[in-house]
Amino acid sequence: ILTHANPDGDTVGSGFGLCYVLRKMGKNANVFCSDPLPKRYGFMYEGYIPQKFSPDKIIAVDVADPKLLGSALQQYAEYVDLCIDHHVSNVNYAKMTLVEPDAAAACQVIFKLIESQKLTEPDKLIATCLYTGISTDSGCFKFSCTTPETHMAAARLLEYGFDAAWINRRMFDWKSRSRIKVEQH
């Protein structure tokens, strides 16, 4: 599973949420990003252990254009089997593309796919990942991309028992020491 460079909450949540879904289904799956994953998203990948296997499918999540993969993953761009995205600007570079431009986040598209195809029952960690992506890409549900479907997906994810208030505070209210220092100057 490939995510975009300069990772945000949606690409990290999509990548790890989908990875955990596939693993729960008995599939081998790993997440790759050209850039280091920000520590603020560590709660989504702290227990993640990469698996050793040769992939037969490559999925890109929240990657509208292969240029967004970054230099470390650019070599895989022409081999992407499936792209799951929500950007109307998607350039359809994958063999198959699932784009829902009315969705607030790729995580919303993935959750809809999980439900509609009855892939597996999400657990608390999967729900945490998917909710985080929806929350961050919707600006904590205040951006115009937020729809009734966005709220319904978030509500269904909340049923899995994670702490949404903590996630929203961490994503929108907490500042790193380095950011505080920059703002003080």
Regions found by a protein language model. Give the residues of each.
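Glycine-rich, phosphate-binding/catalytic loops in enzymes
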Residues: 18-19, 75-78, 99-100, 152
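Hydrophobic/aromatic residues located in beta-strands of well-ordered beta-sheets
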Residues: 29-31, 81, 130
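Hydrophobic helix-and-loop "lid/oligomerization" segment in the mid-to-C-terminal part
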Residues: 1-40, 49-56, 136-185
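Short alpha-helices
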Residues: 87-153
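Active-site cofactor/cluster-binding pocket
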Residues: 42-96
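Fold-independent oxyanion-binding glycine-rich loops
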Residues: 4-5, 34-35, 61-64, 84-87, ...
